[in-house]
Amino acid sequence: MDAHIANETKHLLVHGNSKTRALVHIIVPDACLKKAGVDPVKLSDRHRASPSAAPVFRVFAQTRYHATGECSLWRTVFAGYVPSGAIVSALVPTVPADHPRLFQSTPDSGGLFVSLEIECDADGRFDAFTLVALRVDIADDPRTTEVLFTYDELLPPGTRYGADSKRVALLCRQFVAYVNSHPTVSQSAVTAASHIEAAVAEDVKSASGPQVSYGARIDPAEYLFSGGGFDNHQALARLEDDDKEIMSLIRRASEVIAKRNPVRVLSNPEVNGDAHRRQCVASGLRQGARGAHASDSHARVGFNSSIHDATALLLGLEPPDSGRFVNSGPQRHLPPQGPRSPASRDCQSGMLDDVLLLTPENSNPLTPLDWLDVGHAAVAGGDTPRDVWRRRPISLVARKHYGTCETFVVVSYENSTAWGGRRARDEHLAGSINPPVMQACVAAGVDHPRNLPPETRGELIAKFPMLTVPLGDTPPPVAAFDAAAELALIDHFRGACVSALLKAISERLRAEPRMSQLIEYDIPNNNRDCIISVAQRAPELLEAVALAIQNVTVTEFCNSALMLSALSHLNILSGNKRGRLPYHRSWLPSLAGGADAFLFDYYSSGGEVVKVSPVPLAILVTATRTGQHSCRFARGAPDSSSKTYERYLPGECYAYICVGLNRSFEALVVLPGGFACRASAARKLAWPAHLVEPILERYCWTIPSH
């Protein structure tokens, strides 16, 4: 939950109350992370062999606009991973170590807390097909993984605060039960528990509160999948009216008190030659608020500003420990006040830290939740923003993730300004622009918005300018009104790169079937039989490798030498003033190697030929005086913790066939023993010019031109 609060704070600092920017808080459970390719175990410090100051993982987000191919820059977002009981951690306030059974709950799985930015028009309307890409970079995992969320997935039809009423009541009951069974807790907690118990008993008597039994546990699945549907707008309106009525009663009561005991205006004699006219400080303000003084009074020689400030403040106040706002009563329910000023407690400046109360000292908070605030802070030894949010109504909405078919959770808090929060401005994310488009399709009898008549499309574009590209006359760069458009784009890129590589290798072998020992190795006589076996199996091995490359999945492709080299090649061709570098960590060693730096994917040569390297290995291939080439690791010699394939250079081990590419998209296929062939895949890469920028923006860092 701290990640949600941090992201919301950052969002408000950057965008303020912008009408075109919003935020949505989500929890991504372990099941969804696993299906997306993120290993939840590696998101926790527990799997590390030794502690490290470096973060376990970092999360980046990018907005990808509907059908345009355009993207925002990658931006870092705060994220937090809870290994166990992720949803429970949002529903249950902090349980102190010395009070481990304060609140009882049923733990759920782990989950990732993160917040995603939503862009909309000035009326709060958003495009449901715009999506947010979430990238998780794990320190101990060189692979990169993206999780895609469309706005339609992220923004439910409504909130479910009503389903949370039972949890709030159960928190109160559990607190009362714990305090009543533990006499050692502070008196403030006992007082709070007694008031909560009285209020809950009154609710039960009037049957106005949710019916919960003592001993029940807070179960996140119960609130997530049962307890009612979306909040009824009429019911929410009634709640708001009730709140307004309560505040009206409080205001009227304060006016009555003020009429009975009007605030005095005092004119006191001159002090140090200056006339002072002071009003009483409003009740509830700290007495330490500075009074207005004569501007020259501080400059006087021998002037004691501390005593003078106290005198000036207290002149207009009622005497301490007496007056119409204070009477004798039990111990104050507020938390203990902070340390006094350095001055003596007996002098007037020591009174500056006192707090004036609007009502008598034994006056109660308005609701059981107010008392829960006081009691929980007393038991926990203090309060935190996250506990304030936990002790108030929370909306949990289960959503189905399109890419993984798993559930994730959209969270809204009463004290939040993000989507669904009760502190959000009016007309905050008012709705999607797509229902009017669908209605137009039904009226026109077409099955796709781009098949609408030109005049209808023009009307929709005039009403919603963000539909200019999806509904324009020119076919959009990326498929419009298709939730799978992003997957189709990267699969298209995968197909183009695979085709270019295989065509280049095939053309090279047809022109020159013989493969010489391009990589220099000394082969002992006792390995002669292995070399003969490899030579005899070479056609079958190459065919099997080609088949493995052709069947590579999108996830494997995004972590392959093939994709990273293709991105570098496209960046050179684009001629863009803003340089781009593939954000994959495996590409970093290639920055200093130039054309000699190759990224190699390793494939097994025994039995079934499969890709064994989850990420490519950076190898420097340099020419020697003999006309052959030598290889060395770009990152230095591997250590004992390296995987088996990482300990061998291309061609050095008979168990692997290696396929490498450099930044010029030149391929090098190396068989055991160093027998290899080179081919230019760049000449065979056919990628549309209008899709160069979209693919680079998605998978590269952008380097500013200045």
UniProtKB/Swiss-Prot annotation:
The UniProt entry lists the main location of this chain as: virion
Example GO BP = chromosome organization
Q: Name one Pfam family in it.
A: Herpes_UL17
Query: What gene name is listed for this protein?
Result: CVC1
**UniProtKB keywords:** Capsid protein, Host nucleus, Late protein, Viral genome packaging, Viral release from host cell, Virion
* Similarity comment: family membership: Belongs to the herpesviridae CVC1 protein family.
Any idea what job this protein has? Capsid vertex-specific component that plays a role during viral DNA encapsidation, assuring correct genome cleavage and presumably stabilizing capsids that contain full-length viral genomes.
Q: Which organism is it from?
A: Equine herpesvirus 1 (strain Ab4p)
Record note on quaternary structure:
Interacts (via C-terminus) with capsid vertex component 2/CVC2.
Q: Where in the cell is it found?
A: Virion; Host nucleus
Say yes or no: keyword S-adenosyl-L-methionine present: no
Keyword Hydrolase included in the entry's annotation: no
Per the record, the coiled-coil ranges are none
Region Disordered: start and end of each range? 321-347
- Report the HAMAP family cross-referenced here: HSV_CVC1
**What is the name of the protein in this document?**
Capsid vertex component 1
Q: Cellular component GO terms, alphabetically?
A: host cell nucleus; viral capsid
